[in-house]
Amino acid sequence: MKAVLKIEFQRLFRSVTFYISMGIGLILTMTQFVMVGLQESMHILDAYSPKGISEPYGVFSSYFGMAGPPLVYRQIYYLILPILAVFAYATTFCVDHNSGYVKNLYTRTNKKYYYAAKYIVSCTAGGLVATIPLVVNLIANMMVLPSLKPVAALGCYAGNGIALWGDIFYTHPYIFMVLYLILIFFYQFIFVSLALLLSTWVNNRFLITLFPFLLNYFSYMMLSFIKKAKYSPIIIMDMTRINALRFGPVVLECVCLTVLFGGVYFWRQKKDEGL
């Protein structure tokens, strides 16, 4: 198992698709930084008015996950995250079967080790391409803006004190950022698990990449129609929508969907003959 896992991680860090996904994410987050954070760093006091309820520009008001307009970069980012997470490495399952790689591998190791290693590395890759661009944006903002502690009474932020980790945001904002990045990291497991599951039936790399995105967007539309959009991953991963979220349902959704898709994926390995 360790040998197969090591090989898969080596393949990951040599994978062009991993760096393409990471690059797309970085383009979006760093463009937002140039348009918002960098501009605000040159005029930090412009947002402050001693006669009104306001505060100077800071890290948390300019950060990609929390900033105001332009919103297009954040909207695109959260919308295409399923594509980036799956394209990073999960599609190599399909490539391995189409190329005959697994036929050779199954003669030297147990296929359950390959399935487990592929799952671990694919989920890790998906989580990394989703969170590293956000971390880079946060660090960039920290380099040019002051870390002003958020004040709930000012009403400058989307979240309130009773929102998901809202109390943590207003007392220890960097801990809040870490917690939310962890949440986003693990939510990619849903999309990656679904893509790997689909790969056990379909050998079309394009379809495997797009299907989790399409299903995620369709579920968002359906949940919006029945006034339950807060349960959509598109909403859950957006830090500005935390007022509608509660810890229990958010974690339960992530665990249940990941276990469901991942469980069927591992069950399907019994039928895999490497053909």
Task: Show which residues each predicted segment covers.
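Membrane-helix interface segments
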Residues: 16-17, 110-112, 116, 204-209
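Extracellular/periplasmic helix-loop-helix junctions in multi-pass membrane proteins
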Residues: 202, 222-249
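Central hydrophobic cores of alpha-helical transmembrane segments
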Residues: 21-26, 205-219
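Helix-loop-helix units of permease transmembrane domains in multi-pass membrane transporters
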Residues: 92-125
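Aromatic- and glycine-rich beta-strand/loop motifs that create alpha-glucan
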Residues: 1-25
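Junction motif at the cytosolic side of a transmembrane helix
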Residues: 197, 255-275
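Secretory targeting signals
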Residues: 26-90, 94, 120-192, 196, ...
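Juxtamembrane helix-break-helix junctions at the cytosolic face
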Residues: 21, 192-207
